[in-house]
Amino acid sequence: GGNSRGLLALSSRQGMHRFGWMFAYGLRRSDFFKLKKTDVFFTNSFTQGFQSLVNEINGKPKFIVLEDDYPSISDSLKKNNFDLIYVKNDSNIEDNIKNAIIKFNPDFLAISVVQWIDGILIDNNFLKSLKLEYKNLTIIADGTQFCGTCNFNFENSPFDVLISSGYKWMLAGYGIAFVLIKNNF
């Protein structure tokens, strides 16, 4: 309907702007990551941003998550009693993810772009191929270990949402994080 821009209701987006998800600072970030300035929000950490985001998701969707991924991902999803499908994080990570998608038909893939435990970078081309093949799959990414390491165009990425703490490679210090949301979410 008219009040929705995808899964996240317009009122939720407006609330994010009112309650600390500072819009003005998003202007520069939008240029840096190549996205619309209205799709950038700020929060104090990845964990807070992710938890706030998943609190807005209704129903009981299925999420694919990686074993040993950043604990805030699975912890936040468990708190909301979502169905979690754990995928083994090993040398066959891409096959493991794709096989789980085929078998379980999840609504979401929640994943760190770079795994915090071993530094494995998830291939964006692999994720793009998943988005092309599985049109209803929504990808939410933790970009904390990734953002700032290379050029990144959010609009051309496979991610529907990317959340990143700024303390890692963005040199922002603790207490600064950002949420990038595509219009279809």
Predicted feature residues:
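Substrate-binding/gating loop at the entrance of the active-site cleft, primarily
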Residues: 44-47, 65-82, 90-95
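A glycine-/small-polar-enriched, mobile loop at the entrance of the PLP active site in fold-type I
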Residues: 1-24, 31
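Active-site PLP attachment segment
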Residues: 157-185
